[in-house]
Amino acid sequence: MPSFDIVSEIDNQEVRNAVENAQRELETRFDFRGVEASFEWTSKETTLSAEADFQLQQMLDILRNKLIKRNVDPDTMEVGDPEHSGKTFSQKITFLEGIDAPTAKKLVKLIKDSKLKVQASIQGDQVRVTGKKRDDLQAVMALVREGKLGQPFQFNNFRD
């Protein structure tokens, strides 16, 4: 019986490269000359720090562009609120990985409401879809790509 898994993963190395490229661009941009602004990367989150709130927005746009160039979907970013401390503003960005329980339930409901002859089951941070026909599974893939559930999904472990 054919099956596949729906997962939500990001390549941490590509995200790190995008953050480093954004930092390099920040150092060469004219509007950031003489300004203390930086990107700080940790394993699951990035911290943006700058002297003004509008500079954080510019930095966020730079980071989005760099992520797109590195083939990382910017929808994986969860942007926190800007925090002001002293003379600097900082903003934390976390990268979503894995499918949380409410999103998995929405995904299963979306698949069941489509009336396709497939079964969807939640297995930890992924959703397994099984069906008798390969065409049904491909229809589910198209349905999930079209559905706007707030995060990007990948399909792996396709078995016949």
From Swiss-Prot:
<keyword id="KW-0547">Nucleotide-binding</keyword>
<dbReference type="GO" id="GO:0005829">
    <property type="term" value="C:cytosol"/>
</dbReference>
<protein>
    <recommendedName>
        <fullName>Nucleotide-binding protein TERTU_3542</fullName>
    </recommendedName>
</protein>
<dbReference type="Pfam" id="PF04461">
    <property type="entry name" value="DUF520"/>
</dbReference>
<dbReference type="GO" id="GO:0000166">
    <property type="term" value="F:nucleotide binding"/>
</dbReference>
<comment type="function">
    <text>Nucleotide-binding protein.</text>
</comment>
<dbReference type="InterPro" id="IPR036183">
    <property type="entry name" value="YajQ-like_sf"/>
</dbReference>
<dbReference type="InterPro" id="IPR035571">
    <property type="entry name" value="UPF0234-like_C"/>
</dbReference>
<comment type="similarity">
    <text>Belongs to the YajQ family.</text>
</comment>
<dbReference type="InterPro" id="IPR007551">
    <property type="entry name" value="DUF520"/>
</dbReference>
<dbReference type="InterPro" id="IPR035570">
    <property type="entry name" value="UPF0234_N"/>
</dbReference>
